Amino acid sequence: VLKRALESTAWDGQWYRRGSFDDGTPLGSRNSDECKIDSIAQSWSVLSGEGDPARSTTAMEQATKMLVDDKLKIVKLFTPPFSNSEQDPGYIKSYPPGVRENGGQYTHAATWFVIALAEMGRTDEAYRCFSMLNPVNHASDEAAAEHYRVEPYVVAADIYAGEGKGGRGGWTWYTGSAGWLYRAAVEGILGIERRGKQITFRPKLPSHWDGYAAALKMFDGEIKVRVIRDKKTKSISLELNGSKTKSGSFEPKAGEKTEVVVKIPA
């Protein structure tokens, strides 16, 4: 019932609306003067597993076109920012246009966008956006570091998009988005997932990667992982200590060393 209601009222034609104002006016709609499209609704239509697949594909394509800013190296929360709207969206409008949540990069939402892209198999786009979120890439030279203005070794909660300050980092050292960025890397791209004692491998690597190696220390033991592309492989396959398994998951034994080879299609 809830899913039908969402699809019938929240779909705006090319993306999902963020919500509605108290008077019923849509928020995050193509008819909105400000905040036409918001990333969170698009990302979670994928991550929830409840969005119509065709609609989610269209929505994420539109969000990529409208919210990913290659020049500033940011993924905006929404666009355009609130400025002159007669509707009151709340405290967010108190920020200047392009600052923090008001049309800048809200890094929590940006990490969800990366994970959603990876989940859809749009691995090159996921990696491109992840690279934008990686703080070290905002200080590639002295000029970039001077413009960014904050530490390139911690995650910024927000990055500005406003005129004259676009690309400048905001709040640092105090954001839960650091944990989400870690998950975007380890689970979203490398494809290493832990649920309870079960480890699952679903690599979603960019096309220019041949694979990777990793060492996982858990359950008082060590798991050495090699992921390789293989032309003969049609779907993900897993080998544990040289023996093939029937699935991409296994439960490590406490205190043991395990060698894992994950083969993915080339």
Functional labels for PLM-detected ranges:
Residues V1-A266:
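Acidic, mature catalytic/reactive cores of soluble proteins
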